A protein has these predicted regions:
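Glycine-rich beta-strand-turn "strand-cap" elements at beta-sheet edges
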Residues: 87-90, 165-178
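Basic, often amphipathic N-terminal segments
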Residues: 1-81, 102-161, 167, 177-189
Length: 189
């Protein structure tokens, strides 16, 4: 019998989206659940991930992450206005609201990763791929072969929205769910 030796992920860092966009994307999740039975990721608040899930070593706590972001990221005034341009997908596996990538997203991600690694060395690592910000609607349990139709339906919604990137949120695993543990707000001006 094979045992899973992957450490249980405990935290990730992201940006919560405004309530109006969150409500629209929650409607999309409900559609994916009703039409295709999708449930994966639907319990997680709508967000853009900056630092993917990682296991925080026992000698550290969420408070250490909060302090690192307050000390090393918030003073840099990295808030900005972002833009969603409809929907896209990573293959057949992940449907997302297409957040337009730019240097402001990359800088916010890089500074956040650096702060987390300074506070809790080795707990995560910077992704080597170019940063593609996105707000996941459904993932992992989308039936094979339906993504083209799903994208056609979703893109008929013409989701085109500006939104403020005005927070960094630390998500914590509670049982089998991710919850917003702490949200650190900042100005976009």
């Amino acid at each position: 019998m094979k045992h899973n030796n992957i450490p249980q992920q405990t935290h990730f860092i992201g940006v919560l989206l405004p309530e109006d966009i969150t409500c629209r994307l929650e409607d999309c999740r409900r559609y994916m659940n009703k039409a295709y039975g999708c449930k994966s990721g639907h319990g997680t608040p709508i967000h853009v991930t900056l630092v993917p899930p990682f296991k925080l070593p026992e000698e550290y706590a969420t408070a250490d992450l909060i302090l690192a972001i307050e000390k090393d990221v918030l003073p840099k005034r990295l808030g900005f206005t972002a833009y969603i341009d409809n929907f896209d997908a990573f293959g057949d596996r992940t449907l997302f609201a297409n957040v337009i990538a730019d240097d402001a997203w990359t800088k916010l991600r890089d500074e956040t990763v650096k702060a987390i690694l300074n506070a809790c060395p080795g707990c995560t690592k910077k992704d080597k791929k170019p940063f593609q910000p996105h707000a996941t609607v459904s993932n992992r349990d989308i039936p094979a072969g339906v993504m083209t139709k799903v994208l056609q339906v979703m893109n008929e919604l013409n989701l085109a929205e500006d939104f403020p990137v005005d927070n960094i949120t630390i998500f914590e695993r509670k049982g089998n769910r991710w919850e917003a543990g702490a949200t650190l707000e900042f100005s976009i001006y």
